[in-house]
Amino acid sequence: MKIGIIGAMEEEVTLLRDKIENRQTCTMGGVEIYTGQLNGTEVALLKSGIGKVAAAMGATLLIDHFKPDVIINTGSAGGLAPTLKVGDIVVSDEARYHDADVTAFGYEYGQLPGCPAGFKADDKLIAAAEACIAEHNLNAVRGLIVSGDAFINGSVSLAKIRHNFPQAIAVEMEATAIAHVCHNFKVPFVVVRAISDVADQQSHISFDEFLAVAAKQSSLMVETLVQKLAHG
């Protein structure tokens, strides 16, 4: 099995990259992909850059050139579910765009023409992720993760997301674009991220302060998940 892993930022990939054995680096289209073995399992780790376009381009390159069997999206996210705090884990059962609006033509808010309203994560990957969470006794929430090209740091933008997606558990900037690409290429995916901030007017301060905490927790989860997927 070959597992694709995608993180947007240096801080979100560095702990995993440092553990890859026989590591090789491939740079293409402005993104970096690190290949090798993570605890004996073949992995391809992509540092995509921030935002939907970067994430979609990177995911496409990863799938086209390295042919992963599954893709895990890792990193940080802003918490929307009331029970979440910094360092907690979110697992996607679905991903949607929070900044797409073609409702004038009869589509659901967040839905793009020719696409489903949401992109469903793989049930087996969700179950494996939740088993890993239980092993580490971490607080976690499974549900809808929404994505857009904005860092949510104000009451107006937050209220809009909560109005349009009251069931959303977390918000970030890449997951749905990755899910969209995986859907088109028929590659199973799951999003496993750690909370770096609660999406409010102080979220930029929390993000800077707690990104390292989120990166450590999400990397731990991904490493455990890779082992579980490879060895059961």
Swiss-Prot record:
One of its GO terms (molecular function) is adenosylhomocysteine nucleosidase activity. It comes from the Bacteria. Pfam families: PNP_UDP_1. It catalyses: S-adenosyl-L-homocysteine + H2O = S-(5-deoxy-D-ribos-5-yl)-L-homocysteine + adenine; S-methyl-5'-thioadenosine + H2O = 5-(methylsulfanyl)-D-ribose + adenine; 5'-deoxyadenosine + H2O = 5-deoxy-D-ribose + adenine. The active site is at 12 (proton acceptor), 197 (proton donor). Substrate binds at residues 78, 152, 173-174. InterPro entries: MTA_SAH_Nsdase, Nucleoside_phosphorylase_d, Nucleoside_phosphorylase_sf. GO terms for biological process: L-methionine salvage from methylthioadenosine; L-methionine salvage from S-adenosylmethionine; purine deoxyribonucleoside catabolic process. It is an enzyme of class 3 (hydrolase). Pathway: Amino-acid biosynthesis; L-methionine biosynthesis via salvage pathway; S-methyl-5-thio-alpha-D-ribose 1-phosphate from S-methyl-5'-thioadenosine (hydrolase route): step 1/2. GO terms for cellular component: cytosol. Keywords: Amino-acid biosynthesis, Hydrolase, Methionine biosynthesis. Its EC number is 3.2.2.9. Homodimer. Catalyzes the irreversible cleavage of the glycosidic bond in both 5'-methylthioadenosine (MTA) and S-adenosylhomocysteine (SAH/AdoHcy) to adenine and the corresponding thioribose, 5'-methylthioribose and S-ribosylhomocysteine, respectively. Also cleaves 5'-deoxyadenosine, a toxic by-product of radical S-adenosylmethionine (SAM) enzymes, into 5-deoxyribose and adenine. Thus, is required for in vivo function of the radical SAM enzymes biotin synthase and lipoic acid synthase, that are inhibited by 5'-deoxyadenosine accumulation. Belongs to the PNP/UDP phosphorylase family. MtnN subfamily. This is 5'-methylthioadenosine/S-adenosylhomocysteine nucleosidase. It comes from Escherichia fergusonii (strain ATCC 35469 / DSM 13698 / CCUG 18766 / IAM 14443 / JCM 21226 / LMG 7866 / NBRC 102419 / NCTC 12128 / CDC 0568-73). The gene is mtnN.
